[in-house]
Amino acid sequence: NSGGGLGDSIQLFSLILSLQNHFKTTEFFYLGAHENHFEGKLKEYNINIKTLNLGLKYFGFRWWHILFAKKRFLNKDSDKIDLVIDLQSKLRNTIILNKIPHDHFYSATFGFKFCTKKKEYLSNDHLENLSSFLNINIRKIKFNLRNLHEKYKSEAKRLLPDKNYIGFSLTQGNIYRKKNWSIDNFITLANKISEKNKRPVFFIEKKEIEL
């Protein structure tokens, strides 16, 4: 389970690949507050993970979901999940997610109090904590750029041929929220970065005409 923003999904690359590499015969599902970006904007990265769609918009962000999470899951002719991995940090989201039938539950929320296995989780790295949780050593797998289609790498080299770039995302990866920062703040910071011989780059979707 993840918040569902584009940035949230990108940060999951290594975790998903590592778990899929270790548990090769296991079926993985993604449950987020919004669309599964691995089947949409990030599909070119070829990270395959199925969507668990409970039909609850903004899943975990509405208290009334607590009344329907279990029922919607059972209506999918599913019994329970072997392991639920909660990557949120809000108490509300975790409580709602915990309603889905499961054998084991991993969550960093509230000092890991919701974990079904009580241990000392000392790392900020979920993969390290999951290795401890499962009593196994899960090898970390990073995304390999060689897995990207050559046309995307060629386009990246065309747009960014040099080095020392620092990227700014001017829009919110979560389409239901707005950036707290104004465009003026981004420009001010970009100017300061330029003074340090870095090259600011602004990531803007074509549809963002005003920007």
Describe every region a protein language model picked out:
Residues N1-L211:
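Catalytic machinery of carbohydrate-active enzymes
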